Amino acid sequence: SGHTKIKVAVDT
């Protein structure tokens, strides 16, 4: 959604 690159991978 709109977090850090690390979070983006989990936010898919």
Curated annotation (Swiss-Prot):
It comes from the Eukaryota. On the 2D-gel the determined pI of this unknown protein is: 8.3, its MW is: 28 kDa. This is Unknown protein from spot P3 of 2D-PAGE of heart tissue.
